[in-house]
Amino acid sequence: MSVQPVFSPEVAKRNGFDFLRLFFAFSVFMAHFGELASISVWWPVSSAMGVAGFFIISGFLITRSYYRSAGLRDYCLKRIRRIVPAYVLVVVACALLLSLVSTLPAQAYFTDKDFYTYLVANLSFMNFLQPVLPGVFTDNAFPYINGALWTIKVELALYAFVPLLALFLRRRPGFVLGTVYVLSCLFDHTMSFLYESSGNELYLILERQFLGQIRFFVAGIVLLFYFDFITKRHVRWLLPGAAIIFLLRYFFIGHWMIEPVYPIAFAVLIVSFACYFGKLAVVSRYGDFSYGFYLYHYPVIQLFLCVDWMRNHPACLFLICFCTVSGLACLSWHLLEKRILRRNASQERQQP
């Protein structure tokens, strides 16, 4: 029997997903601010949890977008238009503008092979090949230009996985989703075990890549396919159960009994929150700033640390960084992201 994703029109129009994405982006900002500035910052949501939340929401919304698209080409173009323009902007802008704070003279900077390697590697979403620019942020605690970009290649891989996964979801979605989920959990557990046994950070890096993160994405898809079953028929016991699992994992990170069910529990909490707090949709009226906030926050923090502004005044440094990132995110949305999305939507309506 075929099962199709269900998502009521009322919830589609009024939900808190944009608010949650902004919240998770801010959580990643908080974690990176503390790490880069070597400041102890307390925030209830870690960067890993924020990224996991992003992937869960993506699994839910992007899969829904695929089923609502006119075809594979339409789906791919939508994903490219949403992700690529702002990504290219932040990579190119950092490469050009950060020459102003490089320890190298302009001529040496722009003729250095690392400058071009950075552009090629990062524009190819292979950030790990060249995460630094010549002479930039060399006196910071970490010399990386944008340590947040590693998730974008994972996100794109997950987007590409959706059409392939959809081929197998036509008849036995529960079995297929369950199989992919379990395999991802096994991969995550194996990489964690190997890292703890050997101390080799390669296993930790592999754990954070596509195969380890797909469990969160699939958890979001599960909530989409069984939306009514989970959020309406059985929410009375599923929601408290998910909350208990989430809290246990929060206070006992990495326990082998909790880790396999944590993504599903987190997904239940996220989707339930987004659907039952529809008033938070007011955030969407002003724009979807979460992507820009996520893209720009890391280099902004690094830049202010590099020029040594307010380093001895953490609260002022935080406010300056937050306001700058927020401003860039707003400008990026209104001047670039929204215009591209709106222009292409208009072109699609004009096509016969």
Predicted segment positions?
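Short, Lys/Arg-rich, polar N-terminal cytosolic tail immediately upstream
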Residues: M1-R14
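Alpha-helical transmembrane segments of multi-pass integral membrane proteins
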Residues: I244-K338
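Solvent-exposed interhelical
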Residues: L156-C185, L224-W237, M310-P314
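Functionally critical transmembrane alpha-helices in membrane proteins and complexes, commonly lining
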Residues: A12-Y67, V84-V88, L211, A274, ...
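Interfacial loop-to-helix transition and helix-capping segments at the boundaries
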Residues: A12-F17, I39-V51, A141-V154, T190-F216, ...
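Transmembrane alpha-helical segments and their boundary/interface "anchor" motifs
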Residues: A48-V51, Y66-L104, A108-F125, L158, ...
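Aromatic-anchored segments of alpha-helical transmembrane domains
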Residues: F26-F33, Y181-L194, G241-I253, Y296-L303
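Membrane-interface helix-loop-helix regions
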Residues: V88-V154, Y262-L269, F273
